[in-house]
C-alpha cells in the first residue's frame, strides 16, 4: 500500500514500530513529523529526554526518546522508544539507529 511505501521512504520499517492498524491511520504528514522528531531526538537529546510531535490537521501525535547511547566501531548509535498516539490509542515501539558518515541516522 502507499502507506507502507511512505514508511519505507521515511526510513521506518512499519512492522518494527507500529501495528498495521496504527500505521494505516497515519498520513504522510504524521510520518514525516514522526521521522523528524526521531532524527532530532537521536542527534540532540539526552537519554530519556523526549522530542514530541503533533499534527494539528490529523490530531495524531507522538514522542520519541533515546534510552541508551553506544558505539559500533566509530559509529555513534542509540536505542530509543517511540510512542505514537492516534485516536487516543498509544502504540509503543523500540528501535536502534546508528549515525552514518553523512550525518543521517539509519535504523538497525
Region annotations inferred by a language model:
Residues 1-43:
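Short, low-complexity, glycine-enriched hydrophobic/amphipathic alpha-helices that associate
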Residues 33-94:
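Amphipathic, membrane-inserting segments
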Residues 86, 101-102:
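Short, intrinsically disordered/low-complexity patches at protein termini
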Residues 95-101:
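Short beta-strand segments and strand-loop junctions that repeat across beta-rich extracellular domains
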Residues 102-108:
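Short beta-strand edge/turn micro-motifs at domain boundaries
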Amino acid at each position: 500500500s502507499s502507506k507502507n511505501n511512505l514508511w519505507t521512504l521515511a526510513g521506518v520499517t512499519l512492522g518494527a514500530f507500529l501495528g498495521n492498524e496504527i500505521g494505516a491511520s497515519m498520513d504522510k504528514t504524521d510520518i514525516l513529523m514522526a521521522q523528524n522528531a526521531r532524527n532530532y531526538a537521536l542527534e540532540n537529546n539526552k537519554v530519556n529526554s523526549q522530542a514530541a510531535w503533533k499534527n494539528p490537521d490529523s490530531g495524531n501525535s507522538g514522542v520519541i526518546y533515546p534510552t541508551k547511547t553506544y558505539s559500533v566501531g566509530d559509529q555513534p548509535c542509540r536505542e530509543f522508544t517511540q510512542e505514537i498516539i492516534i485516536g487516543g490509542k498509544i502504540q509503543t515501539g523500540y528501535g536502534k539507529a546508528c549515525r552514518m558518515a553523512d550525518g543521517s541516522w539509519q535504523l538497525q
